[in-house]
Amino acid sequence: MTGYCFTSGEELIAICKKEGLTISEVMLRRQQELSDDTAENILKELKTTLHAMKRSVEEGLTEELESVSGLSGGDAMRLNDRAEKNALSGTLAAKAAAASMAVVEVNAAMGRIVAAPTAGASGILPGVLFTCAGERGWNDEKLLSGLLTAGAIGSIIAANASISGAEHGCQAETGSAAAMAVLRSIIVVRMSSMLRNLTMIPAISSPSRMGRMEASRANPLIS
C-alpha cells in the first residue's frame, strides 16, 4: 500500500492527521500515486470535469429540454422559478434541487454530463456544489477542492460497497452521490465525527454517458 491510499474513513483521517493535510490534498496526492502523473495535469483534467458539470447545470436551467421519449423536460426551469417564490424547503435547498434536476434533464436529452458517480445520479453533486458556490462565492479553486473531497468519500464507497444501481438499487447511486455532496459541505466542521466509522462511499469519473465501474474503483477521481 502506498502512502496516500485509504479504504476507510478512519484510514483517511489518520493520513490527514499524520501529514497535516486536508482531505482534498490527500486525495490529490493519492491520485498522483495511482496515475503516476503530476498534480498540475490532474487538476487540469479535473477542471475540465468541473466545467462540464457547470455547463450541464446552466443548460438545464436556461433551456426547456425534452427527453428523447418526450416524457420529461422543463421541470428544472419550473422548479428554479418556484425556488424564488418562498419555497417550502427554503430557497437554497430548492435551488440546489433545481440545479440537480437540470443535469438530469440534460442527461435525458442525450446531452453531456459527468457521471458522479453514475449517470443516474449525475445531478446531485453539481447541483449542491454550484448552488453553494453561488451562495458563498466559491471560486474554481474551492470547487476543485470540493471535487477532490467528494472523490475521496466516493472512493471509500467504491472500495467497500457499490455505486451500481443495477447491483444494489437506486440508493447505491443517489445515496452515494448525496453523501459525496453533503460531506463536502460540512467536512471542515465535522470531519472526524462524520468519517470515523465510514466504510462506504463513489468515484468521480470523467464526462461520459456512463461511469466505468472497474476504472472508477481503481482510479476514483478521473477514469
Regions found by a protein language model. Name each.
Residues 126-138, 182, 186-187:
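Alpha-helical support elements that line or immediately flank enzyme active sites
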Residues 110-128, 173-177:
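Conserved phosphate/anionic-ligand binding catalytic regions in large, soluble enzymes, centered on
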Residues 90-107, 142-162:
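Acidic-glycine-rich active-site phosphate/pyrophosphate-binding loop
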Residues 165-173, 177-178, 182-186, 196, ...:
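A structural signal for small-residue-enriched, beta-sheet-centric alpha/beta enzyme cores
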